[in-house]
């Protein structure tokens, strides 16, 4: 019998030789790999050979033939389309009364991976932890994920908020027809939320709606001040409760004043829905604690000591303009000392610091609390919703350390490099030299175009007047002479066209060293050699096999009191421009984000559900000017912040780790990814130390592949997979080499294949990653020796 599995479609078809005349009604084994052909549909889908191999083998599978037709090869096609009821059952621990469990998946009944259209499950009355549901479908394979959600009210009605979701690279999967008994599938199967295929992977939700916001309130440093206490109070407790100022809050939690109560407008209070709210409860994370994850507040809050503890309070809301917070201060004995309100008028900007006086029960002010706040708004620059079919935000395949090209082929303005840093040519040079990823810095121009450049300022050269009505023309050498003045201007104050046309120099130019590239050279240059390429140009012109480590540059206050760049773009607007470029035009490219600004990291992770985020950390340093933000002051604090913010990992400064490697071990305990950057990586022995002894997941350094030749690990793994399939007699699908090119003249022009956030691009990216992640798995299945994961040690 000739057996061929074709591409998965809404109707799974089995093709066999016409002369056989019958099909076996029970399959006692799986088809060999050589018998399976993996075909690719136009939408990037296809039969997932590896997912099929993971499923338990089912015997005595009934085949119900509903229709017959002949294909071009005179084969009889038997279509199996009888409806099957698929059951879902999942156990979820520590669920709150206002939360429910949902299932989202690959067919329309399950929302086609759109969270807002997911199917709610019903709580089992006999087992309060278990949630159940079922659907009827005729598809061959069904993929799905569970998530925890709750409803909030907005002006447009009720909104489903994703609180926690299963963020596995591979969704759960079932072969509906093959695993069914009497047209019932998964009858006795009970899943455990967040656990699948021997792994645990749960991620926080993301912002889905234009009016959805996440509010973060932070207490740290000398945040609590009492007016009349000679000795500082210790172990005070702080609680923050959100409320909508349009509605009456529950009276039990508020201070009652001895001189009576204010008159309230009861008619207005009657407008509040009885069981719905515009905001979530507030959770708290203690970054100074060994377990910095968010959890529910106690009735008397959480302990805070000045200059010791770092608290972060978090809530979601759909009406930020009416959101206020009731802040209570308790003594160590858990008796309320005082309280105050943070009103919407205090939280008008997207970020800032507020100083609020708090009063006791008699209405007398007794102290002050200082609070930092951040408002994260939803990403609104996309053409459609963000789907849940594939995600890399929590995915990392453990292998030898990846090698990342710093600013492409290396720093060229203060060190020697073969190519000018942060140019298309430099990025492609690093890719040609075998870089797995390239790291570069992204910021915005005055006309809000994302460009690649490291520093926040440039030097503009201006010739001085010499009193002549018509000064004679000057050569470049004369322009480089003492006749020039240099004026420092922020990149944010120059349009892209100005950056392309003006005679600019790097800030280090007055102290120019030998063999160091100038920012702008004399004469004409090819476009790929010029500075200030746009992010869109990089996404479409750089070798698609090399991943991007996109450092989101945002200026910060330094310990010396100097700000890197004052009066910068508002954070939400800034991040949205960069994210929109990547989400629309990245295609299959591997992407990770990073930033020294912890708030930028939180925003990038909260606004999207696809790409991972690393926190860039300076730590304790003598080489660089440290930042004021306490979360960047030590590498250990950076680990706690990243763990609490649900980031993939931390990118450490080599200078700090060479003195104390413990932060890497701490990050490993949290299951986080660790990268390292820094000038110490100019030495090969330091690279080997971080790779082989500390076991970091990635190293970022200059002049990659110049001293020792190497190959991109993803290309090597793909070739190994093809070799394995070739040994087994199977073929592998051919994929497009790169995204369609796009003109760099218009930053808002999308390539034809990515004009919208399409399902096709997402499916392609997921399939590409799945194929490369299953090299070792496939090798084990085939029992073929002599193949291994791509070697990261360079060869001459």
From Swiss-Prot:
Residues 401-711 form the GP-PDE domain. It comes from the Eukaryota. InterPro entries: Carb-bd-like_fold (IPR013784), CBM20 (IPR002044), CBM20_GPCPD1 (IPR034839), GDPD (IPR051578), GP_PDE_dom (IPR030395), Ig-like_fold (IPR013783), PLC-like_Pdiesterase_TIM-brl (IPR017946). One of its GO terms (molecular function) is starch binding. Its EC number is 3.1.-.-. Residues 78-195 form the CBM20 domain. Residues 726-796 are annotated as: Disordered. Residues 728-765, 785-796 have a biased composition (Polar residues). GO terms for biological process: glycerophospholipid catabolic process. Keywords: Hydrolase. CDD domains: CBM20_Prei4, GDPD_GDE5. Pfam families: C2_GDE1 (PF25329), CBM_20 (PF00686), GDPD (PF03009). Belongs to the glycerophosphoryl diester phosphodiesterase family. This is Putative glycerophosphocholine phosphodiesterase GPCPD1 homolog 2. It comes from Caenorhabditis elegans.
